[in-house]
Amino acid sequence: MSKGHIIRERYETTAKGYDELYRAEQFEKYFIALKRFPPHGRVLDAGCGTGLLIEYLGLNKLLSGVDEYVCLDYSRNMLDIAKGRARLYCPSKCLLIEGNVEDLPFRDNVFDLVYSFTVLDLVDDLEKAIMELSRVSRGRVIMSLLKNLKYKDLLLEKEYKLLGTTSKDVIFYI
């Protein structure tokens, strides 16, 4: 069984408790990223989980410049929770799709901005996932990685630019 399938199963069973455990940690990443790259136009939230980014954007009145907001996640249970947030914060602009960041079901260059928080640490093929995120974006791709991962330094040595850090994560963009 692939790493992705194992992770998917884990999120399927832990979806209900995710927000309680990770909301503050995720909001810290969003604060850092959104200072520089607020959402606009067509937005992809790749690995949206329970929709915490939608909640953050809605609470901070940052959805007005968004024409369409696409939530993609590999876990059906996480998407079910995200659906409630989508209805609350952007009912007419939100689309939820079950999918994998290593094989995105979109044409090239269709999104103005792509966010992918707490996802790349979990994929089977990091390079393929980043290539897919870049492929579907005509603008920036904002991502996070755990600080302690060995490939984090290699990515930051390339064309990736550092946005900031939290106690656990590095937030960067291309």
Language model regions located:
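Conserved class I S-adenosyl-L-methionine
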Residues: 1-38, 52, 149-151, 168-171
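Glycine-rich helix-loop-beta junction characteristic of Rossmann-like nucleotide cofactor-binding loops
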Residues: 33-40, 61, 104-105
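A short, conserved alpha-helix within the catalytic core of class I
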Residues: 123-132
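Class I SAM-dependent methyltransferase SAM/SAH-binding core
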Residues: 44, 49-103
